[in-house]
Regions:
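GHKL/Bergerat-fold ATPase module in large chromosome/replication-associated machines
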Residues: 115, 133-155, 175-627
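GHKL (Bergerat-fold) ATPase N-terminal catalytic module, capturing the glycine-rich phosphate-binding loop
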Residues: 1-186, 194, 431
């Protein structure tokens, strides 16, 4: 029995396979089970045209056995098996895939099979946990069985042996534990069950293993019951993925249970999106919009991504490339036989297929959210409460690259409707002469309602959108227009038709007062002007072009030392008694007039939610004027 050397893909390649290509040792079991599944599929396919096989799909199975004393882990199948030539070609040449050759040979005729393997390297991943591997196999139609043995890169042997039935046994001699690695975990029943359910739950043949169970001893007394442990063979995998079933055959409670169990959520999903696509890329997807915001959603710890499967075998737990950032809240699975896998299965080549799937899913999610908005407004508002901010961030991100896709999904609170409305709904209610989509930004709905700048528009019945999140104004700036209507902040300079002319006339009539206030306040304000929009309030602050007060607050919160500051324009209501008192003081008592001017400016700061530049000075001034 001469030892044979691996062919050209020699010791260096095997070392690379074991130590570099695979990042998680636990995936070896996935690879071995996938090979067993391929073997079953090949014989199952042959049975379709060869009655002598005498087996149907329900007769095939994969078995896992553990021998702790010998430290062996065995995976057996009753699939097609291998002969000596197959062993030479498939196991004697690293990275040679018999499954890939099979798929090439049968072509479209094998569309109903689930052959997984492509590269042939998966078998050697077992050397990550085993120091010796024995393969005992007998091919369908052959009388002889063969044994392949190897301890790694030093080569392998092939000898004739006995095996009663067709199939293959992979016997892995598990390495001894080290200080860094506890290989014995792969001899524990609970760990093997965990790995099967994680990676191979949807292999379409039963994966059987004896598991330990506990039962009450027969005849033991009720007051002191005794229990015994026994072994029972159990199927570890569920076999048929729920996403492979017709949607009409799946009950809502089944989808809900799958979601809760799969993604460890206490709440049912708000919406289920089932996708089945054929064509350039064939795939199935089962997506979920969570019914509640994950507790870590707005933290750095949250990871976006969909579980990615190839023919029911888990390839990647969270494939971030399948979801755009604005839909990062979506959970789900994608299963495709068309993906180009790299040699380790763990990393996916960034190829055209993946990009096509991602683009199609983005359109599908947008479409389903649009339907939810149209058909279930209450449900959509619940979704918006949970994830609306993410949609807004999507509008703003990448310099507005996704704004056209997302703008129809936006909701903002309406001053007239007293509830969230879409931009389309706002525009449909605009007055014929109205040119702008008006909005006001503030810390809360209540505070915006009390802003002096909104009073005139609200009294005239003009609808205002209330922006209460820091991203809202950035969103409006990126959109700029909606259905050819420009966004305009009511907190900016004069916005009403003809208002500028009225303000100029008032300023001319009281020029001395405005000049006096500007001189008193100096660089604290860019300009002091008359306001045509103030009704019952004496004063307000408006921002100059470019940066609003809410944006200033945002930048200050993110970077407290930031020098970014919005231009301050002080507007005075010339018809208010406070202005009249100021005007009288300018002539009669300039020192008191300076105090009035300072007080009005501080009041404007408070109304705008901006910090006072001299809080103690403000309180002293109020107390002094009360004397």
């Amino acid at each position: 029995m001469a030892k044979r050397q691996f062919k050209a893909e020699s010791k260096r390649l095997l070392d690379l396979m074991v130590n570099s290509i695979y990042t998680h040792k636990e995936i070896f079991l996935r690879e071995i089970i996938s090979n067993a599944s391929d073997a079953c599929d090949k014989l199952c396919y042959q049975a379709l045209t060869d009655d002598a096989v005498g087996m149907s799909r329900k007769d095939f199975k994969i078995e896992i056995k553990v021998d702790k004393e010998r430290r062996t882990l065995s995976v057996s199948d009753n699939g097609i098996g291998m002969d000596k030539e197959d062993l030479e070609n498939n196991l004697g040449v690293i990275a040679s895939s018999g499954s890939y050759k099979f798929k090439q040979e049968v072509g479209d005729d094998a569309k109903d099979t689930d052959v997984i393997g492509q590269f042939g390297g998966g078998f050697y991943s077992a050397f990550m946990v085993a120091d010796h591997i024995t393969v005992v196999t007998r091919k369908y139609g052959a009388d002889a069985a063969w044994m392949w043995q190897s301890s790694g890169a030093d080569g392998y042997t092939i000898t004739e042996c006995e095996r009663d039935a067709v199939g293959t046994d992979i016997i892995m001699h598990i390495k001894a534990d080290t200080d860094d690695e506890k290989y014995s975990e792969f001899l524990e029943s609970w760990r093997l069950q965990e790995l099967v359910r994680k990676y191979s739950d949807y292999i379409r043949f039963p994966i059987r293993m004896e598991v330990s169970k506990t039962r009450r001893k027969e005849g033991s007394p009720d007051d002191k019951p005794e229990y015994e442990t026994y072994q029972e063979e159990e199927t570890l995998n569920s076999m048929v993925p729920i996403w492979q079933r017709r949607k009409s055959s799946v009950k809502p409670e089944e989808y809900n249970k799958f979601y809760r169990d799969k993604f460890h959520d206490y709440a049912d999903p708000q919406k289920v999106i089932a996708v089945s696509a054929e064509g350039a890329v064939t795939y199935k997807a089962l997506l979920f919009i969570p019914g509640a915001t994950p507790f870590d959603y707005y933290t750095k710890e949250y990871e976006k991504g969909l579980q990615l499967y190839s023919n029911g075998v888990l390839i990647m737990d969270k494939c971030a490339d399948l979801l755009p950032e604005h839909f990062r809240f979506v959970r789900g699975v994608v299963d495709s036989p068309d993906l180009s896998l790299n040699i380790s299965r763990e990393l996916l080549q960034h190829d055209r297929q993946l990009k096509v799937i991602a683009a199609n899913l983005e359109k599908k999610i947008k479409s389903e959210l649009g339907k939810l908005l149209k058909d279930d407004r209450e449900g959509y508002e619940k979704f918006w409460k949970n994830f609306g901010r993410q949609i807004k961030y999507g509008v703003v991100s990448e310099y507005g690259a996704h704004k056209d896709l997302l703008q129809d999904l936006l909701l903002f609170y309406s001053s007239t409707e007293k509830k969230p409305v879409t931009l389309a709904e706002y525009v449909s209610r605009m007055k014929e002469e109205q040119k702008f989509i008006y909005y006001a930004a503030g810390e809360s709905l209540e505070k915006i309602d009390k802003l002096p700048q909104t009073e005139g528009l609200r009294e005239s019945g003009t609808e205002i959108l209330y922006f209460t999140e820091e991203v809202d104004e950035f969103c409006a700036q990126i959109l700029h227009t909606f259905q050819d209507k420009e966004f305009r902040s009511v907190l900016d300079q004069e916005i009403e038709e003809g208002a500028e002319k009225k303000a100029e006339e008032a300023a001319d009539a009281h020029k001395a007062v405005f000049d006096f206030v500007k001189e008193t306040l100096g660089d604290q304000v860019k300009e002091v002007k008359a306001s045509a929009r103030l009704k019952s309030h004496p004063v307000c602050l408006t921002a100059g072009e470019g940066l609003s007060f809410e944006m200033e607050k945002y930048f200050q919160a993110v970077q407290p030392d930031s020098a970014i500051r919005a231009e301050r324009i002080l507007e005075l209501n010339v018809e208010h008694p406070a202005f009249q008192a100021l005007e009288a003081a300018v002539t009669a008592d300039p020192e008191k007039a300076k105090k009035y001017a300072t007080l009005l400016y501080d009041q404007a700061l408070l109304i705008a939610g901006l910090p006072l530049e001299d809080p103690s000075g403000y309180t002293d001034l109020v107390c002094e004027l009360m004397k």
